[in-house]
Amino acid sequence: PALGRIYLPTGSYEEMMEWALPYDARVDYEAALERIKGLELWERAASFLKGGFWRNFLVKYPESNHLHKRMLQLSKKIEGFGEDGRDPPLGTSLQREGCALPAEGVRERAREELYRSQCNDVYWHGIFGGLYLPHLRHAAYMHLIRGESLIDSSSHREAPWVEYRWEDLDGDGLHDLVATTPCLGLFFDLDQGASLVEIDYRPREINLVNTMTRRPEAYHSKIREGKRKNPSPTEGVKTIHEMEPVQDQVGLEDFLYYDWYRRACLLDHFLGADAGLVSFGRCQYAEWGDFVNQKYDLKVEEKRGGELQLIFRREGHIWFPSGPAPVSVEKKIHLRGDSAPLVVHYCVQGLQPFAIQTIFGTEFNLNLLGESPPERYYEIDGARPENPWMGSWGESSGVEEVVLKNEAIGIFIRLRFDLPAKLWRFPIYTVSQSESGFEKVYQGSSLFPHWDLSLGPREKWNLRMQIEIGEPKDSLGKR
């Protein structure tokens, strides 16, 4: 017979529950552990110090939550596709290890991609790189995009097509927007500046906004302290969870800068004249506007021919040292079902009864899977800058076009502006813990085209930009 009744609590092994804690809580938890370990009651108290819960990772890292919810969306999409499991159009095949899979039905093939996207390492971070490793995130997104494309190619037999969904995508209780075409998948977070948090280029199965926000980790203090810990012969064998990573790279503390907003695209900034490339790149500048991480209103207009116009608008303020000035920002995005470039129209209007001067710009954070030369580089107005690599810092004036290109995977992104811009560019690096020590990881490149604004009472300022994504053979070099 049973010895008794027991209900097991949710949990995992000790280290996992510690890693899942938010930064401040983990610092306090580690301090409490160190204090209690010196007391006689340690052995009796240890079982009650549980730390966090695995799903805290989805709160701690919005990038993990986004990926997790994308995975759930694909699962629902597969289940709602229908029981017939229609095969995709003729000529569509799914490549695996160099061989075409047999046509077993769309649902089964998409479900296989779903399962591949669920490989757990990419959804969290502990002593290994996990979520901080871009190639792991890329692999998960690749399978998600591939699975979605299988469903969509069968659901939409006639091209071109455009569809959108307005729903709570990230589980925060607020509505977001997803717009898709045969070529693109666009994911907007309305309550975070109507920012574009994911751009899927579906022909190459890649998310181009595969970037991590720089945020503090409890182990960063060891880097600042220059702490090295080599095992003593008398300490005995340690598990991998007990080992202290060795700081084997000099200067990692120079990359410990933290962001106060999530790195994405179409982030709208207002700056003062004292802001510069270095302070902006280190996120140590003064933000004058209240648009970057605040809510925008949305209006969707369906055009003839299956086209969409997405209109995001916010009335906010520029917080000058002398006081606030009301201002509105409207960004209209025109989306077509074919492979035409995205067209973005900005309108900034001063709502104040007096003239104002400021700097306005929109930030892009993009990752073309690597920073290293010679395959990955910038072109600015048709020519490579002095230091063109993705990992470079640079400032250029009078810019009408900037191209990011990765020849290794055959993809480019082109931004065009109808008003010449000043362009800042810099890499995003994080410092994370791995089994081999602390390491600097390239997470993407940030571009910030911006303009000097002088607005009179009720005056409007307008900008038109194009965002083109494709493969070099398509249109790179055409003007």
Predicted regions span which residues?
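Active-site and substrate-binding clefts of carbohydrate-active enzymes
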Residues: P1-G85, P102, V106-L177, L184-L186, ...
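A cross-taxon signal for low-complexity, glycine/charged-rich
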Residues: R86, G91, R96-E97, E104-G105
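Hydrophobic, well-ordered secondary-structure elements that form the walls
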Residues: L114, C183, Y346, R458
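Beta-strand-rich recognition/accessory modules
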Residues: D168, C283-E330, D338-H345, L351-Q352, ...
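Short strand-coil-strand connectors
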Residues: T180-P182, R202, K405-I409
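Acidic-aromatic substrate-binding/catalytic surfaces of carbohydrate-active enzymes
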Residues: P182-K299, H317
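Short beta-strand micro-motifs enriched in acidic
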Residues: D189-D191, H334-D338
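Polysaccharide-binding surfaces and accessory modules of carbohydrate-active proteins
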Residues: A340-P341, Q349-K422
